[in-house]
Design a protein with these regions (language model features):
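A conserved amphipathic terminal alpha-helix motif
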Residues: 131-163
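Hydrophobic ligand-binding cavity/cleft-lining segments
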Residues: 1-48
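Solvent-exposed residues in well-ordered beta-strands and their adjoining turns
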Residues: 20-24, 67, 83, 116-118, ...
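Hydrophobic-ligand binding "helix-grip"
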Residues: 44-48, 52-58, 67-119
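Short, flexible helix/strand-to-coil boundary loops that buttress conserved ligand/catalytic motifs
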Residues: 32, 42, 93, 140, ...
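Hydrophobic pocket/interface hotspot
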Residues: 28, 38, 62, 80, ...
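Short, solvent-exposed aromatic-acidic interface loops
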Residues: 94-99, 127-134
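Lipid interaction determinants
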Residues: 10, 102-104, 118-124, 146, ...
Length: 163
């Protein structure tokens, strides 16, 4: 099992996230773009990702929350901007409320997720762009790296089940 690699660039407020998964591009793409599969891996344990609405298309969105073991809900919204099927998609991600309104008290970010065949499976490269160095630092302090790596471990388990 591969480990998630993070490269921060404070000169352009980006974080490059790379991970290889043992699955085909089609399997990994589905896991990132279908709500029933996202529910199986997106949230770091012991949280669960619960989709309220999802419309994976340019101009669509994914409105979801992470449900904590104590019943707490952390709402998020991902607006899909551009999609090249089975290759990449971009989106604007933000914390939100249950109605889908952005929570401007917490930093948002722009994602470009790229899927390529390589090695034993599929390499996913995520370029996360922040509005400022301070926003990148705040998200990092909130546990982004640890949480995303845990979610990636969940995805590894899901891909084994999909074989």
């Amino acid at each position: 099992m591969s480990k998630t690699k993070y490269t921060e660039n404070t000169s352009d407020n980006t974080m490059l996230v790379e991970r290889e998964f043992n699955g085909t591009v089609e399997q990994v793409w589905r896991a990132w773009t279908e709500s029933d599969l996202l529910a199986e891996w997106w949230a770091p344990e012991p949280f669960k990702a619960i989709t309220k609405t999802m419309d994976f298309r340019e101009g669509g969105h994914w409105h979801y929350y992470m449900l904590g073991p104590d019943g707490s809900k952390f709402w998020c919204m991902l607006h899909y901007l551009q999609i090249k099927n089975l290759e990449w998609f971009t989106g604007k991600d933000s914390f939100a409320d249950e109605n889908g309104n952005d929570n401007t008290d917490l930093p948002g970010m722009h994602w470009k997720n790229t899927f390529t065949s390589g090695g034993a499976g599929t390499i996913v490269t995520v370029l996360v762009t922040f509005s400022s160095k301070e926003d990148m630092q705040k998200i990092t302090e909130m546990g982004f790296k640890e949480g995303f790596a845990m979610a990636h471990d969940n995805l590894d388990k899901l891909l084994k089940e999909m074989k």
